[in-house]
Structure formats: C-alpha cells, structure tokens
C-alpha cells in the first residue's frame, strides 16, 4: 500500500525550487534594462555585500540572496508575484521598501512582469574555495585506531574476560553480593523501582535454594514488565536530548510526548536496536504494512525534530545551518560515538574527518524538512508545520489552549481580521497578521467535527534535494564549493552512496549507521548498557570513541559484547540479561584494601560499584514508599501548549519519565540530582553529593509529604512501634534492620521532641476514608492525574495525600530520616 504523509501547513512560507531551465536572451535583457538598475538604486544601500549591510538578513545583490531571503523568509518566488515578499514590500503592504518613498508605478509593474516570467537573473554569488588539510593517506592511517577496527569476538564470556584482566593486574574478585543487596540492585537497574517486601522475601528464598536460577528468573520477570521500558527508555531520551520546549525563547513543543512514548514502547517491545535507529533516522521512508506501523515510524523521526532551536534567530540561513548542525551532531554522537560536528568550521582537530565530510553529511539533512510544530507568534521567527498522523488517537492535545471557541467563531474572527488588514499598513498590519496566524493555527488543528487532530513531530523528504556548500568557518555568508551528499570517508568500507538524485540519503545513512560492518554502532551501545548496569563504562568517553577519547579498560570484553549484540540481532534485553546473570554483575561492593591499592577506581571490576540512585529512581522510589505512585501512563503531557511551572513535579504522582521537561526549567526534584542536560546529547549522568540535595530530602515538600504518607500507612497497618520500625527498614533499605540500627531507632523515638503544624489529610483507598479536601481543591492545585492505576506502597496500601503543611510526628520524621540517608540513596 502506498502511504502518503499528510502535512498540516501552519502558516509557514516554504521555499519553492526553480527549474533549471535557462532564461532566454530577451528575458535577460529585460532584467538588465529594468530590474538590475532598480535594485541598485533602491535596494543595494541596505541589502548588498558591497555596501557591507544585510538588514533583516536579506541580500538582494545575487539571485541566491533573493531566493534564500531574510528574516521573514524567501523574498522571491519565481512565477508568482502575489506570494513574493519583495512584491509585498515594494507595494508597502506590511513591509515598506524602500522606506523613504515607494518606487514609481512603472518600476513596480516591471517587477511584476519579471517575477511572473520566472525571475531570470544572471547574478551568481562568487564562491570561495575551501582546501582541506586532511589527505586520503591521513584517512587511511586513521583507520588503524582501535575504534575503527572491526570487532572480533574473543574466546570466553563476560566472567572469564573480566577475570583474565583481574589476574593480569594482580587483583582478586570480591565475593558475591547477598540476596537482599542483589535484588534491590537488579530491580533498580532494570525497572528503576524498589522491590516490594514480598518480592524480596520470594527472591531471598529462591536465592538460597539456587542462586543462578533465582537471578535468571528475576531478570526475566523484570524485563517483561512495562516499567522496564520506562526505565531504559529514559536512558535513550538522555541521548536524544528529549525535552518539551525548544530552549532559547523556550517555545513549547506540544507534541514531543509522542516521541517519548514511542521510545518507551520500543524498549518494551524489544525492537531490535538497528531497527530502532533506522526508524528514528528514516522512519518516514521505511515500508509499513499497517497504518499503526506507519504511525510509529513517523513518530520515531521526532528524534531529529526535538532538538534545541533558536527561534529568535532572524537569519533563516543561520537558523537552518544551526538546526542541521544539531541534527548531525546528535546523530553521530548517539550512534557512532564521534564528534563529527567539530568539523563544521574546520577540519577535525583529532580525528581524520575533513570539513567536506561534515558537509557531505549536512547535505542529507539540508534535503530533509523538519516538522517541529511551533506557531508563528511574537519572538518566534521560525515557525514550523507538524505531521498529521494517519492514526488518530483522539487525545485532546491542549494545543488550542485558552477558552474553547467554535470553528465558526474562529472563521468569523479570521474574516474580520482580513477586513481590518485591507486598510492598515506597517506595524499594525503585522500585529493583525500574527493574530490571524494564531487563530488559523487553532482552526487547522481541528477536524471538521471539532475533535482535535493527532499530530507528531518528525521529518520528511523535501520536494527538491540539495547538496551543501562548505561554509568557511561555518559562516553562512561565506559559502565555498558544493560537495555531494555522502558519509564520512573513514567508513568507505560501507560503500555508502545516495541511491538517486531524488533521495536525501537518510535511508542510506540509516542503513550505514546500523550495518554490521560498521565498527562503532554495537560498541557504542554496549558501552552504555554496561555503564548503566555496572556503574562505569568500559570507555570513559561514552560519546567520543575517536582519537581524543579514552581507550577501553577491557577491549576484549567490549568487542565480545559488541559481537554478541550483533549475533543476537541487536537484542537489548538479551544483552541486559547476559550481563546481569554474570558473576561480575553479582559481586559485592565490599572494600578490599589490597585491591584498592592496585585499582582504586575499580577500573577492572573486582567489585560492584556503589552508585547513587539517579533523579528519576529516587523520586519514583519515594512515590512507591508513600503509596502514591500512579503507574498508568498519563495521556499527553501536562506541558502541552503552556509554560511548565517550576514545581510541576510536586503534584504529579506519575513516574518521573512522564514529568514535563522544559529545557530552561527542569523540575527541582530532577535538576538537583544530576538530571541530564536536555540541551545536548547526554550519554551518562554525573554523580554528585552536594548540600542542596540533603536540604531537599530533609526539608523539601515532596520528601516531607512522601514521608508523612509512608508513616500513615505504617500506622494503619501495624499496631506496635517495633513493627513499624522494622517494616520501615524493609521498605526503605530492602533489608531487615541490624541490632545497632534498632538500638539507634529506639533512642530516636525516646529523645524526639514533638513539633506540630497543620496536619495533612491522608486517605487510604482500601479503608474508604474520605479526604477532607474537595476535588475542586485538587483541581486548583494542578493535579491532572485523573483515574489511574495506583501502585500500592510496600505494605500493600494505596495512599492519597494532598500537599500541604506536614505534621512532624515522630514516625514521619523517622521515615524522612531513613529516606534522607545514604542507605536509601546509595545502590550497593
């Protein structure tokens, strides 16, 4: 079945490509007699290279300058004077050129004739010449770097390859971790949530009978849960620099959440990694058997659309150049672990990647149209379309915002504005046009029956393919020679060629990136998987496998993992399973003095690496302990069509992966705990321990509310203080308390001085107790949860606590103390 992507044009003026037909002599004479003199007389002073001025980003001294246009878009659409901005400007319709006085009527008439005949213009921009310093011999020599060699599978397995390195270094492996430590580690690593007491008890029992079998069964159970995709999908969202706003002016991306959901579903469905990458680079070009598959492929290309954009950039060429650079940089770092974008302004300083290789790749993205879905409003000089999805999900996207209006009302408003614009010039006309654009955007987002359409961010092929010109120093006004679309010459073994002049090359790029002959794709991904499970990558520079990057601490192990990954048809779950069941993963984190002297940083994995819980796991664990976690996926996103509040995380009880991510306003519960920078590709999180984190855990509203809810659940389920204390340790630490901890707890309660403020109201659903607060209050507080599956807390209770002043009861303070401790935050 042939599938066509339906495009919603939201008030965006595209550039039309002109046929290559040569103008006739008569047409050129008309230009030289009537148009060139007028441009020189009326326009060159403000819009030419010789004058040293390009006001509003517009140059009119070459044909390319007119076609590319300036801040407001292409100035010239050959064959169509009515849609050409230069025609509007010389008639003083919204724009006024020249500003001092209008051109004579006969000159204006000449421009109409000239544009409608195809705008013949012999003036060509003089190109500079760029000469690379990197030779073919340099590139050939560069292939000797370890990362550019084809990985070869060594003899052995994970444990034998690790033990071989330990023996070489004179190190002894630590003992295996106890069952309590191991089940907590496995749970957080695979699903990002703590195990319940019943799960712990079952695992400990099974582990004592057959440790290997218990681990295998636990791993398989967790990999089958939907929470796995939420945990591991978030790892990829770091790489994909996922956010729901553009950065810079922070224009919202109302439909970014669809890409987020695609990623989570892909991990849960165990989509092979090579297919996962192909979908994100060229999903719109892949065959699809059903509308659902086509829908999924389109949403996958949101990977190229969700990056940071400078919407206040007035020069459209600069905006496009920066967007292409961001797409190219993200793609090459994410999949290849190479900093190809460093060759944008000059030859790469470390790797044999010449600047023309950068622009060979850039041509692929210049031939791709990006749909990121921001409407033309004040301060957004670069609006965009969206892709209308073939499968409508009836999600009330909220993109309309504000008060509801009927379609008829909006049509009447547009007609009224059109009438007002007829007698208005200058600034007032532009303001009316912006107002019209906003209303038209709302109207275009509705079906005829008034229901919202389903849109997605993504990319598609442009109507006309282009090759990129090398830009000297990366400057858009310093173009040099054109280079054909292609791939980095380092990988000539992949035999990359663009299949036709009508192809951007994205489909071929996707195939090259995931080819089993590509030495980097499998290595880069397996290095990250190892890092997420073991705590340290084999290659420290996770997004730079080039000459400036680090060498692997165990190259044989990295190659083993890479080859196994490809042998298993790029099955991520299988590789997670293989690593977690290994004895290397299952080691204790206990300190060994002799080993520490030889390998203080545990580079060779003689023990498990103690790690801090990342921001999402920490917040989600507190929601679980409080019994407040809503494990259902929310519909859409809270951020749709509106700015994200700094405290958006406070009332939101869904998993943290569903929190709205505003590039300039990340929720505090994430930003304080080393959340990935959403402006760039992040392939690993920092681990910091700073005072602000401790203050948040001890004094923050979210932590206090969670502790109060946990204490209330303990009080309802257990009658004695001794039971409550013992169970609290099981819930928070995943193990029973030690005698010393019980003694310290006894002293805590004996010495506690009671202080009180207003008490929160807690309702436990299984007791039927009503909340004192009204539903209206909840709505005013911004709770958008709606009905959903609430995940029971460790004790089996499902709590619902409203935010407010927290009563500092002895038990709630005790619970908050446990949550604030290293025993909770550190994963041993």
Regions picked out by a protein language model, each given a short descriptive name:
Residues 204-214, 752-770:
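Charged, solvent-exposed helices and adjacent loops that form client-binding or oligomerization surfaces
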Residues 84, 89, 161-165, 266-268, ...:
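An acidic, gly/pro-interrupted, aromatic-rich
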Residues 5-16:
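Bacterial N-terminal signal peptides
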Residues 125-127, 590-591, 758-759:
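Flexible, disordered linker segments and immediate boundary regions flanking tandem C2H2 zinc-finger modules
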Residues 8, 31, 685-688:
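Hydrophobic residues within membrane-embedded alpha helices
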Residues 186, 198-202, 362, 737-747, ...:
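Short hydrophobic alpha-helical segments that form membrane-spanning helices or hydrophobic packing faces
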Residues 18-284, 348, 368-539, 547-574, ...:
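Aromatic- and Gly/Pro-enriched helix-to-coil junctions and flexible linker segments
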């Amino acid at each position: 079945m042939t599938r066509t992507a339906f495009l919603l044009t939201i008030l965006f003026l595209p550039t039309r490509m002109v046929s290559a037909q040569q103008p006739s002599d008569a047409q050129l004479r008309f230009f030289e007699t009537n148009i060139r003199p007028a441009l020189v007389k009326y326009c060159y002073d403000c819009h030419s290279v010789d004058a040293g001025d390009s006001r509003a980003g517009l140059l009119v001294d070459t044909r390319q300058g007119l076609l590319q246009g300036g801040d407001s878009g292409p100035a010239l659409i050959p064959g169509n004077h009515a849609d050409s901005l230069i025609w509007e400007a010389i008639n003083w319709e919204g724009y006024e050129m020249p500003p001092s006085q209008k051109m004579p009527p006969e000159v204006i008439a000449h421009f109409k004739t000239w544009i409608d005949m195809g705008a013949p213009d012999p003036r060509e921009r003089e190109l500079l010449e760029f000469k690379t310093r990197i030779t073919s011999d340099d590139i050939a020599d560069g292939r000797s770097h370890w990362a550019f060699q084809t990985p070869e599978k060594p003899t052995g397995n994970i444990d034998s390859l690790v033990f071989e390195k330990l023996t070489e270094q004179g190190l002894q492996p630590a003992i295996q971790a106890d069952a309590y430590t191991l089940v907590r580690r496995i749970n957080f690593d695979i699903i990002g949530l703590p195990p319940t007491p019943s799960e712990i008890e079952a695992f400990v029992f099974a582990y004592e009978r057959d440790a290997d079998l218990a681990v295998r069964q636990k791993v398989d159970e967790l990999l089958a849960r939907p929470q796995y995709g939420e945990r591991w999908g978030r790892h990829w969202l770091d790489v994909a620099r996922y956010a729901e706003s553009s950065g810079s002016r922070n224009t919202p991306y109302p439909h970014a959440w669809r890409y987020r959901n695609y990623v989570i579903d892909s991990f849960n469905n165990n989509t092979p990694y090579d297919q996962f990458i192909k979908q994100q680079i060229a999903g719109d070009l892949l065959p699809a058997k059903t509308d659902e598959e086509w829908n999924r492929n389109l949403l996958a290309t949101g990977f190229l659309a969700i990056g940071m954009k400078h919407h206040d950039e007035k020069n459209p060429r600069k905006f496009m150049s920066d967007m292409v650079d961001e797409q190219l940089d993200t793609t090459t770092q994410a999949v290849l672990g190479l900093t190809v974008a460093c060759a944008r302004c000059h030859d790469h300083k470390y790797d044999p990647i010449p600047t023309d290789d950068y622009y060979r790749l850039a041509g692929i993205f210049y031939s791709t149209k990006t749909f990121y879905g921001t409407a033309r409003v004040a301060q957004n000089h670069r609006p965009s379309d969206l892709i209308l999805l073939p499968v409508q999900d009836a999600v009330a996207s909220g993109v309309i915002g504000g008060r509801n209006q009927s379609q008829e009302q909006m049509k009447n408003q547009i007609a009224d504005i059109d009438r007002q614009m007829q007698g208005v010039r200058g600034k007032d006309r532009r303001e009316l046009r912006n107002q019209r654009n906003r209303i038209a955007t709302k109207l275009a987002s509705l079906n005829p029956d008034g229901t919202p359409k389903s849109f997605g961010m993504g990319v598609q092929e442009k109507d006309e393919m282009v090759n990129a010109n090398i830009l000297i120093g990366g400057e858009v006004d310093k173009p040099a020679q054109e280079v054909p679309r292609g791939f980095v010459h380092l990988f000539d073994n992949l035999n990359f060629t663009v299949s036709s002049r009508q192809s951007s090359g994205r489909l071929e790029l996707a195939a090259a990136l995931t080819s089993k002959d590509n030495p980097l794709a499998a290595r880069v991904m397996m290095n990250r998987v190892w890092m997420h499970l073991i705590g340290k990558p084999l290659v420290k520079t996770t997004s730079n496998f080039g000459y400036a990057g680090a060498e692997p601490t165990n190259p044989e192990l990295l190659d083993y993992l890479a080859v196994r990954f490809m042998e298993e048809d790029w099955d991520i779950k299988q590789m997670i399973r293989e690593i977690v069941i290994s004895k290397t993963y299952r080691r204790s984190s206990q300190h060994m003095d002799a080993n520490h002297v030889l390998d203080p940083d545990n580079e060779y994995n003689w023990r498990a690496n103690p790690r801090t819980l990342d921001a999402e796991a920490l917040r989600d664990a507190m929601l679980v302990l409080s019994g407040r976690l809503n494990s259902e996926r929310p519909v859409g996103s809270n951020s749709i069509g509106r700015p994200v509040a700094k405290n958006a995380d406070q009332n939101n009880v869904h998993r943290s992966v569903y929190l709205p991510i505003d590039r300039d306003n990340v929720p505090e519960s994430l930003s304080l705990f080393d959340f990935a920078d959403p402006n760039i590709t992040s392939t690993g999180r920092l681990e910091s321990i700073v005072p602000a984190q401790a203050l948040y855990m001890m004094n923050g509203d979210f932590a206090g509310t969670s502790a109060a809810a946990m204490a209330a659940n303990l009080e309802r389920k257990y009658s004695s203080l001794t039971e409550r204390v013992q169970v609290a340790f099981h819930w928070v630490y995943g193990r029973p308390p030690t005698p010393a901890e019980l003694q310290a707890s006894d002293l805590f309660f004996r010495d506690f001085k009671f202080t009180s403020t207003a008490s929160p109201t807690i309702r436990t659903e299984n007791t039927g107790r009503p909340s004192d607060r009204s539903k209206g209050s909840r709505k005013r507080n911004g709770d958008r949860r709606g009905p959903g599956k609430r995940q029971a807390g460790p004790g089996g209770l499902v709590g619902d606590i409203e935010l407010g002043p927290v009563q500092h009861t002895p038990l709630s303070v005790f619970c908050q103390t446990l949550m604030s401790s290293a025993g909770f935050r550190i994963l041993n």
